[in-house]
């Protein structure tokens, strides 16, 4: 008898607030929790509770993030808000808080500012699928034309980074007035959440994606063959499935002849399971840690890609000195380190600890990768940076 499946009545969607400092991200977060709690049940969270974000560690990097939850009529939202700009950069690059969509907060009184642009760019680089816009502090702008101008600027900025500016929902409101209970502005929060329900797609569940298992270990079991072990990253695998071994060496095909978990035999394994998979016709030496087992054709090995990278500061245990072009650290993908060479963008001579930078990386061996894959940069086993694959080149 299978375990009872955990039933969620509403789909679960992860979102976050992004935008320039002091444009009202945290106030909006507080306003949404208050209005949704009144309409749909749940807990209202005050500005101060959200603002004093606890420290978390993601891949050895310290990030301050606040997590709140609320219900819309159709969905359950988990929402992240960060106090400082650096926290956003780290959060998005490490994927510590996965975002199915983002709420871009822009003050109508100030219009788009440098971090507005940077957060849109980061969203593009790390693969945030959709953005909805909340023009905040509209109560401070009397001029209708000025509001339209700011809206136009934001839409153009979205277009620049390949988000559909014209189709993006833009809600005009005031988070503070909504918290104070001003009905007209409370209505704008309801409108915003409705726009999120309609415009941000519900994420595909991990079990519905193509199967992939990063290989951690390989054993040979006499009389039975070769077993690879690891945790299934996504998808489902059944006995009899054809799979490929991808990365480091030329791709090989094989068939799954057994799946076991805690020494019990199963018919199938799914995302999140730690399993041993028996593969037909492969010797122990044909497979190694760092490769992946996957659905045939679903993922290809690559060596050259563009990445968005955050370099740890000295305080975070990173490098004490900058690095220059020709830097050759190890790149840790899933279960293994691969050496690679770094090319910096034109006009960038060096990268300081604490910076974030776009770079092109060429690995000495191919690794199974998709855009959006996260990695760590290491020197002799010590993490000195975190990155995400933004664009595959070859």
Swiss-Prot record:
Its main location: cytoplasm. GTP binds at residues 19-26, 81-85, 136-139. PROSITE patterns: G_TR_1 (PS00301), G_TR_2 (PS51722). Residues 60-64 are annotated as: G2. Residues 174-176 are annotated as: G5. Residues 10-204 form the tr-type G domain. GO terms for molecular function: GTP binding; GTPase activity; guanosine tetraphosphate binding; translation elongation factor activity. The keyword Protein transport does not apply. Mg(2+) binds at residue 26. One of its GO terms (cellular component) is cytosol. InterPro entries: EF-Tu_GTP-bd (IPR041709), EF-Tu_GTPase (IPR050055), EFTu-like_2 (IPR004161), EFTU_2 (IPR033720), G_TR_CS (IPR031157), P-loop_NTPase (IPR027417), Small_GTP-bd (IPR005225), T_Tr_GTP-bd_dom (IPR000795). Gene3D superfamilies: P-loop containing nucleotide triphosphate hydrolases (3.40.50.300), Translation factors (2.40.30.10). It is found in: Cytoplasm. Keywords: Cytoplasm, Elongation factor, GTP-binding, Hydrolase, Magnesium, Metal-binding, Nucleotide-binding, Protein biosynthesis. It holds the Pfam family GTP_EFTU_D2. Its EC number is 3.6.5.3. Residues 81-84 are annotated as: G3. Residues 19-26 are annotated as: G1. GTP hydrolase that promotes the GTP-dependent binding of aminoacyl-tRNA to the A-site of ribosomes during protein biosynthesis. Belongs to the TRAFAC class translation factor GTPase superfamily. Classic translation factor GTPase family. EF-Tu/EF-1A subfamily. Monomer. This is Elongation factor Tu. It comes from Francisella tularensis subsp. tularensis (strain SCHU S4 / Schu 4). The gene is tuf.
